[in-house]
């Protein structure tokens, strides 16, 4: 078993054991997930969403550039003509990070200074949760998009090294893969548009 699998199963089993212990010893009310959601500041949820959007998007772009760049370098050893033409795949990977930054800027415009006395309202919770889940959605879409564009860019570089006529055909597939990040951008704008500013 891998380290990730072992830690996941250990955490799950320990959570079940602690939950059952609390349930059978009449202290189940102290494990209240709803109070955790309501006691945490809406600012925290909003800022976590913005941070995760940027983090996942940049990880996806970096991962895609790594996958694509290694294939371009490897293929350019045998066919040096591919190195400049296939840089468009690197640019597609960088666009993924730009999508995340655009959403982060749009979401951060909703974060304002307010009076802490009347802060925990339904509107503020909705805005915080909307920014959180919108950021998670956009970030994960861009993570998947970056990997997708990197893999198709790698295939385009290796196909171009073998046969130059295949480059345009594989580039069309790469463009369709980059649309995944655009879908995430649109979903983020829709979710963020429903949320009101913190005021």
Swiss-Prot record:
Pfam families: ATP-synt_C
Main location: membrane
An individual GO BP term: proton transmembrane transport
Transmembrane segments: 4-24, 47-67, 87-107, 131-151, 171-191
Record-annotated disulphide pairs: none
The entry's keywords: Hydrogen ion transport, Ion transport, Membrane, Transmembrane, Transmembrane helix, Transport, Vacuole
GO CC, one annotated term: endoplasmic reticulum
Record note on quaternary structure: V-ATPase is a heteromultimeric enzyme composed of a peripheral catalytic V1 complex (components A to H) attached to an integral membrane V0 proton pore complex (components: a, c, c', c'', d, e, f and VOA1). The decameric c-ring forms the proton-conducting pore, and is composed of eight proteolipid subunits c, one subunit c' and one subunit c''.
Name the UniProt record assigns to this protein: Probable V-type proton ATPase 20 kDa proteolipid subunit
Gene, per the UniProt record: vma16
